[in-house]
């Protein structure tokens, strides 16, 4: 995996990755690959070597105004990054908590199961950090309403994430 720097994460320049993720024709396919790589420990090691990668993926996710495949892959990728504390801190700093809570508050009825599962897993993982809990405290009412909204889902992953968030 490290033998070929396919996405330029090991180089000082961000040009290659930035161009790939911002290319309207390629960005979905690039995000599918990144999402797959983020599923593996070595893949996360490789991808997170590029400090600006999380910023670019978050911006790509925010640009998408619908629950598209691209936004889903961005969300899934950053959720997988939150298995580590440094990306958790970065995502909290980028205000992803407010973004995902507002997304759920405004679009809950139209979101795919994928977005709901990965979004709630992201909320749970970010709530494990003290800084994350402080951000959630500022929007506690809205967060609780969202968690309540999804409690009737017949999906064990969703219920596990809700439970984990409430207990953190």
Indicate residue ranges for each PLM-predicted region.
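Amphipathic alpha-helical segments within extended alpha-helical solenoids and repeat-rich scaffolds
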Residues: 1-20, 54-64, 97-108, 144-155
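Elongated alpha-helical scaffolds that mediate protein-protein interactions in large eukaryotic proteins
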Residues: 1-27, 36-54, 84-95, 129-141
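Alpha-helical solenoid repeats of the armadillo/HEAT superfamily
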Residues: 21-35, 65-83, 93, 99, ...
